[in-house]
Amino acid sequence: MRKLLTVSIIVLVALAVLAVPAFAITGNWVKDYEHPYVGLVVYYDANGEFIWRCSGSLISPTKVLTAGHCSDTAEGAVTARVYFQQDAGANYDPATGLDPVSGYPEACAPGTLGTLCATSDELYNYGFANFAGFPNTHDAGLVILDQPISMPVYGVLPEAGALDGLDTARGTKDTIFTVSGYGLSYRTNANSAVPSISYRIRLMATSTLVNLTSKNTDGFNLQTQGNGDDRGGTCSGDSGGPVFLGAPKSNTIVAVTSFGMNSLCRGTDYGYRIDRQEVLDWINSH
């Protein structure tokens, strides 16, 4: 489920200790076949035990862009495995604790290592430390793959300052963003008889701009409309997934899914902006 970090800020990571993880694309979503380079990122501790899962994007054959709180080694992340199947965890069986088709979350299925699945023991966190310095949380991360993955297309980094000016220019509130990830699709109250639902498949949804310069964004975060009224939003497990500038066919990543303000995945969503020169420099340095 989402981890409550303060009274109101909630990270969109899916913890391994829960039978049903907590963050996925919600609301008006569709299956995402447009972005084959978006993967399900599974993290393990020093003992090789599954601790949580996120989403991420290949921006080169070996470099996966995700959130800093996902690749936070200070919180126990040591290694990772990334699955690029659209239905990476669709056949997950709680009784056995794995998906017999993909091997999620324990292994790469035979014949998929280096094609649809890869391992990593090289994780980087831009500086995320439990939201210290908010709103500049430094919530960007990288997973460097042991096996290069060939894709017909990769995620594209933005020009520095790509979002600058959108908050003040006329007509920009209708700017479209597309989110993609493997998180929860429905999140209910913990006391509800209706369970949270996680398909563990790659979904995407579109939304529009809310704010870039509020006290919660201040030039570091991107706030978009959440679930409802023909919109889609993010939830637990979507952390680190791409926020694309434009309609679903866009490959330009301007932010990574970072946090929300509601434990039921309602309300607005926040992504950590990567169109800032210092963030781009850090990404390109690895």
Enumerate the predicted regions with their spans.
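C-terminal segment of classical bacterial N-terminal signal peptides
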Residues: 15-22
